[in-house]
């Protein structure tokens, strides 16, 4: 065998060895199971029938996730959800998305069951009227941590009591992995939820600025009343309970067109990735969980 032939065989053999050892798609490990996300929605004042569909479609389009909807079509502030009747209601889910509007649900055992899942480590994403749910006592005054009516606020990280008339909100992001790559934006007509308290340990992600026109009542008292500017924190994170469970919340999302907005859905999806531990501090998501 001449030298040229020997060299060819040596190169061919080495290349063949590399090919055999190279990992195939299956050798790299199986595709991880999709994130199991439970959306709990219903209650007063919003088109949850539409918004749950928008959230499911928007999240599943962006994430390697399966979104399950627990929807109660009731329209009252006393709306409850059958799933919460079980102590292990969150079993099997990687994240709970709270989209309830249940301000007058004051059953302490019921609320404790909800909170226990998060204390035990199940992450949460809270949207809009979830901030105005499960409240009792003198909730219009600042509530101290540890108070009888503080449980829900301790999970959220912010206490809010209301909002003014709808008008566009200028959203300005702070520097954080969740907001990495997102541009400031202005919503359509939306509700700017106030901040009675932003608790220690809460990390602000975004602030909102809104020009509020005088109401009819204000104009009746003062015909020369002028528009005023209101500002509030509109998105934040919190670490809740002994397990420091990750909680992401945004008070935006009253109207369907806001929930359908790409900018809103991108933000919520990134918040969910962060809550479940699949978004780095540098803002880079775990590639296995994005589409």
Regions found by a protein language model. Name each.
Residues 1-6:
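N-terminal secretory signal peptides that target proteins for export/translocation
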Residues 9-21:
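Bacterial N-terminal signal peptides
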Residues 27-93, 279-280, 285-291:
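Aromatic-Pro/Gly-enriched surface loop or interdomain linker
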Residues 28-35, 50, 61, 212-291:
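Extracellular ligand-binding/catalytic regions of CAZymes and related secreted enzymes
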Residues 33-36, 62-67, 91-96, 119-125, ...:
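Loop/turn elements at helix/coil->beta-strand transitions in domains of secreted/extracellular proteins
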Residues 36-41, 89-138:
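Short alpha-beta junction capping motif
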Residues 43-46, 73-76, 97, 101-105, ...:
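Solvent-exposed loop/turn segments at secondary-structure junctions
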Residues 52, 127-216, 284-291:
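An acidic, glycine-rich "communication" segment
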């Amino acid at each position: 065998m001449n030298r040229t032939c020997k060299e060819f065989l040596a190169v061919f053999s080495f290349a063949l060895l590399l090919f055999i050892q190279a990992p195939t798609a299956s050798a790299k490990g199986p595709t991880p199971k999709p994130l199991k996300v439970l959306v709990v929605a219903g209650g007063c004042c919003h088109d949850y029938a539409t918004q749950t569909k928008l959230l499911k479609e928007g999240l599943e389009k962006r994430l390697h996730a399966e979104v399950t909807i627990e929807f109660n079509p009731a329209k009252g502030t006393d709306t409850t959800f059958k799933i919460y009747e079980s102590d292990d209601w969150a079993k099997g889910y990687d994240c709970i998305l709270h989209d309830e509007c249940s301000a007058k649900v004051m059953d302490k055992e019921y609320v404790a069951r909800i909170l226990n899942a998060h204390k035990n480590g199940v992450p949460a994403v809270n949207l809009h009227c979830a901030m105005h749910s499960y409240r009792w006592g003198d909730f219009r005054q600042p509530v101290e941590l540890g108070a009888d009516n503080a449980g829900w606020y301790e999970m959220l990280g912010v206490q809010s009591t209301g909002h003014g008339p709808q008008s566009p909100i200028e959203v300005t992001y702070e520097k954080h992995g969740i907001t990495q790559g997102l541009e400031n934006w202005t919503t359509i007509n939306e509700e700017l939820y106030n901040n009675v308290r932003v608790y220690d340990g809460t990390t602000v992600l975004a602030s909102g600025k809104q020009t509020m026109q005088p109401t009819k009542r204000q104009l009746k008292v003062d015909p020369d009343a002028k528009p005023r500017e209101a500002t509030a924190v509109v998105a934040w994170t919190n670490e809740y309970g002994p397990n420091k469970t990750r909680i992401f919340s945004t008070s935006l999302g009253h109207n369907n067109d806001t929930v359908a907005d790409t900018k809103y859905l991108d933000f919520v999806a990134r918040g969910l990735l962060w809550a479940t531990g699949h978004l780095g501090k540098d803002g880079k998501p775990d590639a296995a969980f994005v589409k």
